């Protein structure tokens, strides 16, 4: 019975905050989840979001998602191996487990679990991203950042990025 209750609880959480069936979620939250689902090649980021929600509901949920997204995307773009990225998500899960509502701020200030190699990330992002696995995600993220989040982005199953920019632009 306990196991089935737990499965049901997390099934509802998934439906509400990952499949976005909760109408009270902001468009900014929905749009970030949408680009993460469309652009990331892994779903290892989902358990921390679900566990955070199970403990704290909407309390700073969007802020947590932004930190998690930056960590997950940053590590992926920097070429961190899948095993190390999974370990990082597990460390975030452990930190959530130790956190209470009273010390929630400490989770957000935990620079160790959300650490990204900013120097490497900046170098990579200033380089050629054509053909990289994360190029599509970066374009989705740019669209997200440039939008005003007045509407929820469509969650197309397949999205392609073709002929957006020339590979070899002219100097002028």
Question: Where does each model-flagged region fall?
Answer:
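Short cysteine-rich loop/turn motifs with clustered Cys
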Residues: 136-158
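A cross-family structural signal marking well-folded subdomains
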Residues: 1-139
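Histidine-centered nuclease catalytic patch
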Residues: 152-172
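Short, solvent-exposed coil/turn linker segments
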Residues: 114-120, 148-149, 155, 166
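Generic detector of bulky aromatic hydrophobic side chains
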Residues: 32-35, 140-147, 169
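Noncatalytic, beta-rich nucleic-acid-contacting surfaces in large DNA/RNA-processing enzymes
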Residues: 90-94, 148-150, 164-165
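Hydrophobic alpha-helix feature that most strongly marks membrane-spanning transmembrane helices
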Residues: 54, 73-76, 147, 166-170
